[in-house]
Amino acid sequence: METFLFTSESVNEGHPDKLCDQISDAVLDACLEQDPESKVACETCTKTNLVMVFGEITTKAIVDYEKIVRDTCRNIGFVSDDVGLDADNCKVLVYIEQQSPDIAQGVHGHLTKRPEEIGAGDQGHMFGYATDETPELMPLSHVLATKLGARLTEVRKNGTCRWLKPDGKTQVTVEYCNDNGAMIPIRVHTVLISTQHDETVTNDEIARDLKEHAIKPVIPEKYLDEKTIFHLNPSGRFVIGGPHGDAGLTGRKIIIDTYGGWGAHGGGAFSGKDPTKVDRSGAYIVRQAAKSIVASGLARRCIVQVSYAIGVPEPLSVFVDTYGTGKIPDREILKIVKENFDFRPGMMSINLDLKRGGNGRFLKTAAYGHFGRDDADFTWEVVKPLKWENPQD
């Protein structure tokens, strides 16, 4: 049996880029909660003792941007300089302007257009992916890397591993075999964890705790064997972390946000963007389409692409590829997709309820992945029943 290795990575909520994603989405939540018609394009950057939010926002909402920044940093665990940022004493800069009227008239006619007439907020192409190798219909390498990162945060916040600090990265290499286009995980080849820690803990303690409290609860025993390689804080020291260790910026973890390198990516980031930005809403609807195809039994593995022009409601193209795993030809699956999914931005907002903010809805998406999550707020993860006829044997 011929096999191959594939690797996916993830980062914790305390990684500086992910901190920025979460702040941008916390701002989006605050705007949409008060004004569902808010137009938000919020970026965040951070470095030692500094967080800046900037971008274009048109909203009737009354938003305290500085409070959102400080609350988000504090909730992650950035409460003192020694962990990389002090939420209560860092400098916060806000540079927010209104959305360009040129963009506004092209996209929604200054709110005069009906939902089905609303144009895409920009050009671009987005991809959705699904695979039957996990219950989440997501790639195993990505699922494990993501869950390891989430587990590190859990055991840090519940006090199981008091030496843990907010910043950290994970990476998992899985050995696969290709079964006529479907991906079959065989074993976990390598587990890599690099996590921020306090001064007092030893490397041996770190390795022991990571195996016991992070790896064992996350990675099923059937995937681990005596040949599995573990790199646990291989640099030997990771005390300086968060924005003190590295600058952070919204939108720099787009592969972590999606499929861990599987499928494809159009390049557009998600966080801080309202649903007229098809970088986000388009990627959400094609994930639902790909997931529904696999869940319905039409294929074992699937990628869906959609593309847009700014100001134009109808997509320019829709593409489906099942990697040879389809029960019927891809051209027939494409017809089913077009019949069952409305790719117009205004209708995606309605059908996926994307104008609803508040309660940390979009903030939740900004750490540990936008897809494969079991959460009612992730409406794009709901499988849509697809009707199709089995070909005669």
From Swiss-Prot:
InterPro entries: ADOMET_SYNTHASE_CS, S-AdoMet_synt_C, S-AdoMet_synt_central, S-AdoMet_synt_N, S-AdoMet_synthetase, S-AdoMet_synthetase_sfam
Any single biological process term in GO: S-adenosylmethionine biosynthetic process
PROSITE patterns per the UniProt record, alphabetical: ADOMET_SYNTHASE_1, ADOMET_SYNTHASE_2
Binding sites annotated in the UniProt record for Mg(2+): 9
Major localization listed first in the record, in broad terms: cytoplasm
Binding site for K(+): 43
Binding of L-methionine, residues: 56, 99, 246, 277
Gene3D superfamilies linked to this entry: 3.30.300.10
Cofactor note: Binds 2 divalent ions per subunit. The metal ions interact primarily with the substrate. Can utilize magnesium, manganese or cobalt (in vitro). Binds 1 potassium ion per subunit. The potassium ion interacts primarily with the substrate.
GO cellular component labels: cytoplasm
Domain of life: Eukaryota
Subcellular localization, as worded in the UniProt entry: Cytoplasm
Catalytic activity: L-methionine + ATP + H2O = S-adenosyl-L-methionine + phosphate + diphosphate
Keywords: ATP-binding, Cobalt, Cytoplasm, Magnesium, Metal-binding, Nucleotide-binding, One-carbon metabolism, Potassium, Transferase
Range of residues in the leader sequence: none
Cofactor(s) this protein cannot do without: Mn(2+); Mg(2+); Co(2+); K(+)
Pfam families, per the entry: S-AdoMet_synt_C, S-AdoMet_synt_M, S-AdoMet_synt_N
GO molecular function: ATP binding; metal ion binding; methionine adenosyltransferase activity
EC number(s) reported in the record: 2.5.1.6
Positions of ATP binding: 15, 167-169, 235-238, 246, 252-253, 269, 273, 277
Pathway of action: Amino-acid biosynthesis; S-adenosyl-L-methionine biosynthesis; S-adenosyl-L-methionine from L-methionine: step 1/1
Family: Belongs to the AdoMet synthase family.
Function text: Catalyzes the formation of S-adenosylmethionine from methionine and ATP. The reaction comprises two steps that are both catalyzed by the same enzyme: formation of S-adenosylmethionine (AdoMet) and triphosphate, and subsequent hydrolysis of the triphosphate.
Assembly: Homotetramer.
Protein name as annotated: S-adenosylmethionine synthase
